[in-house]
Amino acid sequence: MKIHEYQGKEILRQAGVPVPRGIPAFTVQEAVEAAQKLGGPVWVVKAQIHAGGRGKGGGVKLARSIDEVKKLAGEILGMQLVTHQTGPEGQKVRRLLIEDGADIQKEYYVSAVTDRASQRVAMIVSSEGGMSIEDVAHDTPEKIITEIVDPATGLTVAQATKLANAIGVPAGSTAQAVDVLQKVYKVYMDTDASLVEINPMILEGNGNIKAIDAKFNFDDNALFRHPEIVAYRDLDEEDPAEVEASKFDLAYISLDGNIGCLVNGAGLAMATMDTIKLFGASPANFLDVGGGATPEKVTEAFKIMLKNPNVKVILVNIFGGIMKCDTIAAGVIAACKAVNLNVPLVVRMKGTNEELGKKLLAESGLPIISADTMADAAQKAVAAVKAA
């Protein structure tokens, strides 16, 4: 789960990390009132969407008068903001953050992220803040410093000091930078985040350290422990199909291809998508129905997939363990009838009650393309796409 910048800054503020004063706004009038309340003389008008690169896309602007705040708010609110993270379709801006301007002397990059190789948290810092960390990693990788944190000790003063020194924080500001780094690590752990990113963390002219951006990603599986974070959820920023799928406990992620995939098990789902790519096409989605799928759940999965106009073929790939093949077959038959299926359907089933499942499909009278192996299923789905 992602949240907006202003929400992330509220979490940082509560954790004791210095952030600029800011007020969210949903209308131009609210933006003007926010600027008046903050007092100026310089404000930052920032688009709030769940994507990075807003500045380059024209979603972050400086204003030096209330009239300019009003003008910029009117331009940014409602715009379709395109960044390197949104894709060419962009995202509609429905919220703004009106914030005090900052006296920026130096910009740094700071993040806490799950490092799967070490199975620990990695604190990542760079002296090149304010720009895409991916660009820094590509152009000057030596400017990215990583410190792996032992969960038994947390980020120690020695480690935080090492990081602050490595990115050139002046001696007079080192103690505050160390404090901020330790608090970023702590808030990462306390909120069950998968990413906390401050880009940039700045050094002001008076020597103070401040976080002027905040990006949080949270582990969905831990949200039951954090109702206060769930309250930040903005469904307008999420894929409608993914929101709909979550209502039925379906693990669904939209992709750019044209073969809809319905699979049980995340590993098999990823292998299915890889096999589709191997044979020259692309999956339209990741969809794991899990081990407890019912015919009703399969029907909803079909409905969600078919809402995507790019889907030209559906591929069902089931390994029956906990999930029985006859249950999936009954669900597929019910789904085909419920949605009046008008695209080719390829089905491959192996495992528990396999023969019964195949018998149900064969006797259904539906034009189902049967496959024996995953490779066979993928090849038949790709052939159907090319013939469409």
Curated annotation (Swiss-Prot):
Belongs to the succinate/malate CoA ligase beta subunit family. It catalyses: succinate + ATP + CoA = succinyl-CoA + ADP + phosphate; GTP + succinate + CoA = succinyl-CoA + GDP + phosphate. It comes from the Bacteria. Substrate binds at N264, G321, I322, M323. Coiled coil: none annotated. It comes from Albidiferax ferrireducens (strain ATCC BAA-621 / DSM 15236 / T118) (Rhodoferax ferrireducens). InterPro entries: ATP-grasp, ATP-grasp_succ-CoA_synth-type, ATP_grasp_subdomain_1, Succ-CoA_synthase_bsu_CS, SUCC_ACL_C, Succ_CoA_ligase-like_bsu, Succinyl-CoA_synth-like. This is Succinate--CoA ligase [ADP-forming] subunit beta. Gene3D superfamilies: ATP-grasp fold, A domain, ATP-grasp fold, B domain, Succinyl-CoA synthetase domains. Binds 1 Mg(2+) ion per subunit. ATP binds at K46, G53, R54, G55, E99, A102, E107. Residues 9-244 form the ATP-grasp domain.
